[in-house]
């Protein structure tokens, strides 16, 4: 069973975000080195753990883009990727619409990250 759980545990967040198979895909030229990364903990930022049958599979981070729109960032651990990844995003969308004021979810996908683009499209997101 897939669950989504809000967290403010800095160590857990950091361990996922700076993972060698995640950080290079979510950082940019102005990001700190992974060893210097510190997550921002604030009520306006939702750090959401993904668990599958109790096993930690990664996290989603959402933050407000405007009054009804949130921006999504996805960090799925390599051992949990594959066919179940779309289940994680669908569960996330349910969580967002049940627990926040947001009515729309957006994400930005760099051109080099084809796996993220496939996940977004399989999860029902559309290009705008």
Question: Model regions: which residues?
Answer:
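Short amphipathic alpha-helix that is part of the acyltransferase structural core
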Residues: 1-31
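Short, basic/aromatic recognition patches
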Residues: 31-37
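A short helix-loop-beta-strand connector motif used in the catalytic cores of GNAT acetyltransferases and
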Residues: 37-49, 58
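Conserved beta-strand in the GNAT
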Residues: 49, 54-63, 70-71
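Conserved acetyl-CoA binding element of GNAT-fold acetyltransferases
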Residues: 67-79, 108-110
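Conserved acetyl-CoA-binding loop-helix of GNAT-fold acetyltransferases
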Residues: 82-96, 118, 122
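Conserved beta-strand-loop-alpha-helix junction that forms the acyl-donor binding cleft
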Residues: 106-118
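Conserved catalytic-core motifs of GNAT/GCN5-like acyltransferases
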Residues: 108, 126-128
